């Protein structure tokens, strides 16, 4: 359920609407009835910004200060964008400032770790670092002060979030274009891999899927009278002959903040999207459905949101219903498949890019394979030399033992008077091998060491 109370009040302002992260969430296919009762705030959806967590934590802390919340409710979009609201930070409580200081220190520490990781990666010549994007990681912080959260930090955070989220839709369109080009590229490669008969059958199946996808009820133009009346009748359960724009606006202002934000607008397009896309159908692509939802929302914002603050007020909404285009049904809404996301030239460049990346990956894989084979050969030589050395040492030990045994089996020398004469105990004195045998052992050891080649080990994989 959408938040109410102070958090709902934030949605009155275009920037903090974005900061509360409602602009980029895809709405569910079903929506419950409005509930005006106070409910606990739910976790906000992720914007996709790399500083999302920091942004959300700053908002949560500022909301706890009564003075700042009061100024926020009285501020307008220009006050926020110009930095006027940021100066109110000087009047928040010491407890809140302390929390903000700690949040900033944590964010600085996070970015330092990120910088260190990228610098380490830069040491590897095979890794390329985008220095421009690296610098952008710090644009939402005041570089002159890394310890305390000041008005300049709030101003930078607001400006950066406003700019980044304004570019979100363009980035989404570009991502969808690459998705469509990759899908077409893989389709063509698949067809090329088939025999003539199999290719004809695959093409026939694809054409049949495209035909089924095109066969759908007429899609009304988003924001038109026909589209809103359909929501009024089928979703709200009201008499289409008694359609009232003001009542419609109030019904679909879910959090009762006096404006329709982007999420509330996108909820109005659900019935139109269901005419074209069904997740159960093989021919319906859900990625295309989300692109369609975005196109519909952009169309309404372009024609209704006159001050371009990404919010639709009641006055703007009522004014749009007075225009000629509001009641003009025409041919209906042209869906995504009627507007190709890319040209053949863009597809050609995309395929060249894919081929270059594939060649680079293959070259790296080949180098890795060669280095692995070289390491395997070196390891094999090491193992062979180790076994040879072990055998040589064992052989020498056996020769020494044999010599000692032969020495021990010799009879004791006889005394001239016919009595045996035993020598005193000589355990502590080493008994040298006969000169000939010792020379032979030394020669064997020397030859063994000379035969051991130097081992060359690859420096890296």
From Swiss-Prot:
<feature type="binding site">
    <location>
        <position position="264"/>
    </location>
    <ligand>
        <name>Ca(2+) 1</name>
    </ligand>
</feature>
<keyword id="KW-0732">Signal</keyword>
<dbReference type="GO" id="GO:0005085">
    <property type="term" value="F:guanyl-nucleotide exchange factor activity"/>
</dbReference>
<dbReference type="GO" id="GO:0007264">
    <property type="term" value="P:small GTPase-mediated signal transduction"/>
</dbReference>
<feature type="region of interest" description="Binds to GNAI2 and GNAI3">
    <location>
        <begin position="228"/>
        <end position="321"/>
    </location>
</feature>
<feature type="domain" description="EF-hand 1">
    <location>
        <begin position="240"/>
        <end position="275"/>
    </location>
</feature>
<feature type="domain" description="EF-hand 2">
    <location>
        <begin position="292"/>
        <end position="327"/>
    </location>
</feature>
<feature type="binding site">
    <location>
        <position position="253"/>
    </location>
    <ligand>
        <name>Ca(2+) 1</name>
    </ligand>
</feature>
<keyword id="KW-0344">Guanine-nucleotide releasing factor</keyword>
<keyword id="KW-0106">Calcium</keyword>
<keyword id="KW-0472">Membrane</keyword>
<feature type="region of interest" description="Disordered">
    <location>
        <begin position="193"/>
        <end position="221"/>
    </location>
</feature>
<feature type="binding site">
    <location>
        <position position="307"/>
    </location>
    <ligand>
        <name>Ca(2+) 2</name>
    </ligand>
</feature>
<dbReference type="GO" id="GO:0016020">
    <property type="term" value="C:membrane"/>
</dbReference>
<feature type="region of interest" description="Disordered">
    <location>
        <begin position="368"/>
        <end position="461"/>
    </location>
</feature>
<dbReference type="GO" id="GO:0003677">
    <property type="term" value="F:DNA binding"/>
</dbReference>
<keyword id="KW-0175">Coiled coil</keyword>
<dbReference type="GO" id="GO:0005788">
    <property type="term" value="C:endoplasmic reticulum lumen"/>
</dbReference>
<feature type="modified residue" description="Phosphoserine; by FAM20C">
    <location>
        <position position="86"/>
    </location>
</feature>
<feature type="short sequence motif" description="GBA">
    <location>
        <begin position="303"/>
        <end position="333"/>
    </location>
</feature>
<feature type="modified residue" description="Phosphoserine; by FAM20C">
    <location>
        <position position="369"/>
    </location>
</feature>
<dbReference type="InterPro" id="IPR040250">
    <property type="entry name" value="Nucleobindin"/>
</dbReference>
<feature type="coiled-coil region">
    <location>
        <begin position="150"/>
        <end position="218"/>
    </location>
</feature>
<feature type="region of interest" description="O-glycosylated at one site">
    <location>
        <begin position="42"/>
        <end position="51"/>
    </location>
</feature>
<dbReference type="InterPro" id="IPR018247">
    <property type="entry name" value="EF_Hand_1_Ca_BS"/>
</dbReference>
<feature type="signal peptide">
    <location>
        <begin position="1"/>
        <end position="26"/>
    </location>
</feature>
<feature type="coiled-coil region">
    <location>
        <begin position="341"/>
        <end position="407"/>
    </location>
</feature>
<feature type="binding site">
    <location>
        <position position="257"/>
    </location>
    <ligand>
        <name>Ca(2+) 1</name>
    </ligand>
</feature>
<protein>
    <recommendedName>
        <fullName>Nucleobindin-1</fullName>
    </recommendedName>
</protein>
<keyword id="KW-0963">Cytoplasm</keyword>
<feature type="binding site">
    <location>
        <position position="309"/>
    </location>
    <ligand>
        <name>Ca(2+) 2</name>
    </ligand>
</feature>
<dbReference type="GO" id="GO:0070062">
    <property type="term" value="C:extracellular exosome"/>
</dbReference>
<dbReference type="Pfam" id="PF25434">
    <property type="entry name" value="NUCB1_N"/>
</dbReference>
<feature type="DNA-binding region">
    <location>
        <begin position="172"/>
        <end position="218"/>
    </location>
</feature>
<keyword id="KW-0597">Phosphoprotein</keyword>
<feature type="modified residue" description="Phosphothreonine; by FAM20C">
    <location>
        <position position="148"/>
    </location>
</feature>
<feature type="compositionally biased region" description="Basic and acidic residues">
    <location>
        <begin position="437"/>
        <end position="461"/>
    </location>
</feature>
<dbReference type="InterPro" id="IPR011992">
    <property type="entry name" value="EF-hand-dom_pair"/>
</dbReference>
<dbReference type="GO" id="GO:0005794">
    <property type="term" value="C:Golgi apparatus"/>
</dbReference>
<dbReference type="GO" id="GO:0005615">
    <property type="term" value="C:extracellular space"/>
</dbReference>
<feature type="binding site">
    <location>
        <position position="316"/>
    </location>
    <ligand>
        <name>Ca(2+) 2</name>
    </ligand>
</feature>
<dbReference type="GO" id="GO:0001965">
    <property type="term" value="F:G-protein alpha-subunit binding"/>
</dbReference>
């Amino acid at each position: 359920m959408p938040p109410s109370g102070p958090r709902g009040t934030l949605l009155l302002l275009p920037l903090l609407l974005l900061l509360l992260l409602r602009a980029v969430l895809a709405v569910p296919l079903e929506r419950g009835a409005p509930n005006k009762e106070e409910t606990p705030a739910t976790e906000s959806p992720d914007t996709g910004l790399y500083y999302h967590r920091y942004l959300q934590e700053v908002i949560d802390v500022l909301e706890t200060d009564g003075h700042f919340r009061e100024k926020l409710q009285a501020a307008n979009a220009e006050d926020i964008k110009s930095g006027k609201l940021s100066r109110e930070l000087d009047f928040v409580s010491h407890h809140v400032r302390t929390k903000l200081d700690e949040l900033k220190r944590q964010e600085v520490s996070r970015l330092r770790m990120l910088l260190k990781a990228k610098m380490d990666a830069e040491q590897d010549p095979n890794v390329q670092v985008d220095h421009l994007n690296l610098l952008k990681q710090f644009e939402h912080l005041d570089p002159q002060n890394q310890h305390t959260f000041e008005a300049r930090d709030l101003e930078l955070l607001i400006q950066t979030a406003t700019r980044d989220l304004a570019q979100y839709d363009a980035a989404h369109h570009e991502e969808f274009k690459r998705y469509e080009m990759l899908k077409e590229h893989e389709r063509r490669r698949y067809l090329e891999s088939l025999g003539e008969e199999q290719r004809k059958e695959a093409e026939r199946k694809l054409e049949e899927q495209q035909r089924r996808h095109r066969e759908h009820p007429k899609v009304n133009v988003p924001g038109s009278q026909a589209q809103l009346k359909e929501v009024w009748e089928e979703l709200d359960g009201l008499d289409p002959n008694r359609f009232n724009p003001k009542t419609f606006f109030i019904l679909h202002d879910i959090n009762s903040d006096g404006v329709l934000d982007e999420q509330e607008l996108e909820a109005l397009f659900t019935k139109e999207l269901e005419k074209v896309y069904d997740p159960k159908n093989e021919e319906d692509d859900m990625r295309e459905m989300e692109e369609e939802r975005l196109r519909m929302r952009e169309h309404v914002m372009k024609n209704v949101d006159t001050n371009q603050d990404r919010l639709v007020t009641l006055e703007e909404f009522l004014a749009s219903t007075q225009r000629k285009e509001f009641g003009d049904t025409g041919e209906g809404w042209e869906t995504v498949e009627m507007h190709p996301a890319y040209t053949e030239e863009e597809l050609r460049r995309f395929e060249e890019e894919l081929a270059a990346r594939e060649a680079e990956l293959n070259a790296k894989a080949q180098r890795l394979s060669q280095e692995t084979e070289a390491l395997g050969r070196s390891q094999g030589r090491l193992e062979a030399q180790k076994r040879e050395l072990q055998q040589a040492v064992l052989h020498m030990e056996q020769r020494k033992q044999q010599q000692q045994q032969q020495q021990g089996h010799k009879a004791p020398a006889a005394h001239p008077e016919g009595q045996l004469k035993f020598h005193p105990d000589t355990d502590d004195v080493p008994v040298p091998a006969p000169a000939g045998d010792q020379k032979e052992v030394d020669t064997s050891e020397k030859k063994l060491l000379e035969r051991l080649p130097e081992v060359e080990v690859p420096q890296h994989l």
